[in-house]
């Protein structure tokens, strides 16, 4: 169950000093990528940093990194045990996400970081991460429709919730590709609290050294946000370009336009594309990539799709699917530490695909938790054509976990 509010997390953090400055990142899409760019820049600049993003990728502790490296399970469990004890002793009744946030901040205190890159979990104003006492910069990425039952039914209402991460006197970087109405809401809130808004800009000597064609449009905007925020937060002498450039060129963010092999699962020679697009705006960005780089003329694309229960599925499928495509519907498994998250039944996904003009012969219902069979069907249906796995970050996690297990078994017998 999701319970927004700051009283429980504030109590939980009373004994965890925040000696580090935070770059706090909110938004609908692009938050994780911005955080990854920022971590890479801080590491290249030799700033000891931590990062906290959600959801986790494969294991619960991989959502917390120190100097861009996931922490060990031992460190995570030690910090978590202390947080759980405080929660019990003080009868706080904190939520799962509040406990995770407090665990991350406890790790950061122990590891004596200088700067923390913190991704908002949901919204901004009442999100547990907003209990931080010290922020250097806040960032608001692209705003889209998602989690409307918690944040509001319009972009402007959602923007107002995201703007709640601002602090007086702390600059706020805003993705300049946001709609004017969204920018106005954010700027109005900034004026109310006496704050400055800085629109992201792709005009800089740093970005001039990079080729925009090597990035998707959304990635380029995310990089502009990260670079703008970095230079507002980084108060040391200018970080040399020769150190920053490789950090950006080598940065990868799993589950976002990620190309990988599923040979160990299906025997497929060619790569598949993995993307966690789970709302209409993210699906449109994925469509651009698929149409420009994978789909040839009227060639079919084979999709493996899962979605969280309650998502507006037609909004996700409309940009992606064409009548000649094939769709394997699958459910992701239980999400560790997030019992309120449930997968949409596969029958709903195949029905939605049928409504997009894809006949039943081109759809496969893999049932609950049978990702391996969905991938095998997709491999056979695609032939030499492209395969894309999308619709949920939890599906991304399931696939990466399945690959890890397959590779582990393979290594035992090789």
Would you name each region that the model predicts?
Residues 159-167:
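Membrane-proximal helix-turn-helix segments that form the acceptor-binding/catalytic region
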Residues 21-24, 33-51:
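A conserved segment at the C-terminal end of the G1
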Residues 393-414:
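Glycine/aspartate-rich loop-and-adjacent alpha/beta segment that forms the canonical ThDP
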Residues 6, 10-18, 44-133, 151, ...:
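ATP-dependent carboxylate-amine ligase catalytic core
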Residues 177-194, 198, 267-273, 317-386:
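C-terminal helical cap/extension that packs against the catalytic core
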Residues 19, 115-116, 128-139, 143-146, ...:
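Nucleotide phosphate-binding/pyrophosphate-handling subdomain across enzymes
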Residues 103-150, 183-216:
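Extended acidic/charged loop-beta regions that coordinate divalent cations
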């Amino acid at each position: 169950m999701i319970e927004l509010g700051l009283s429980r997390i504030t109590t939980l953090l009373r004994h965890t000093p925040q000696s580090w400055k935070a770059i706090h990142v909110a938004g609908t899409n692009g938050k994780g990528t911005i955080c990854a760019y920022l971590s890479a820049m801080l590491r290249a600049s030799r700033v000891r940093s931590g990062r906290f993003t959600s959801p986790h990728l494969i294991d619960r502790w991989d959502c917390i990194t120190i100097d861009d490296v996931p922490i060990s399970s031992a460190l995570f469990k030690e910090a978590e045990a202390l947080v759980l004890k405080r929660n019990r002793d003080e009868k706080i009744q904190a939520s799962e996400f509040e406990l995770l946030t407090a665990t991350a901040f406890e790790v950061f205190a122990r590891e004596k970081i200088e700067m923390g890159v913190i991704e908002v979990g949901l919204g901004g104003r009442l999100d547990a991460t907003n209990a931080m006492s010290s922020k250097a910069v806040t960032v608001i990425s692209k705003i889209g429709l998602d989690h409307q039952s918690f944040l509001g039914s319009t972009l402007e209402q959602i923007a107002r919730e995201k703007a709640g991460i601002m602090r007086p006197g702390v600059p706020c970087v805003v993705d300049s590709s946001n709609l004017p109405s969204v920018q106005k809401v954010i700027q109005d809130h900034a004026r109310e609290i006496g704050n400055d808004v800085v629109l992201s800009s792709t005009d800089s000597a740093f970005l001039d050294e990079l080729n925009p064609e090597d990035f998707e449009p959304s990635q380029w905007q995310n990089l502009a946000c990260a670079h703008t925020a970095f230079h507002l937060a980084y108060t040391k002498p200018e970080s040399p370009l020769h150190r920053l450039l490789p950090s950006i060129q080598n940065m990868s963010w799993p589950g976002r336009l990620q190309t990988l092999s599923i040979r160990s699962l299906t025997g497929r020679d060619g790569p598949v594309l993995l993307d966690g697009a789970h709302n209409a705006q993210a699906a449109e960005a994925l469509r651009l990539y698929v149409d420009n780089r994978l789909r040839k003329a009227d060639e079919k694309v084979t999709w493996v799709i899962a979605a969280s229960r309650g998502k507006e599925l037609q909004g996700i499928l409309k940009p992606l699917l064409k009548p000649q495509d094939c769709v394997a519907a699958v459910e992701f498994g239980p999400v560790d530490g997030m019992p309120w998250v449930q997968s949409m039944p596969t029958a709903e996904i195949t029905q939605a695909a049928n409504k997009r003009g894809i006949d039943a012969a081109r759809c496969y219902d893999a049932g609950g938790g049978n990702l391996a069979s969905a991938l095998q069907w997709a491999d056979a249906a695609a032939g030499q054509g492209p395969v894309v796995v999308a619709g949920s970050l939890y599906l991304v996690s399931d696939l990466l976990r399945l690959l890890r297990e397959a590779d582990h078994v393979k290594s035992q017998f090789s």
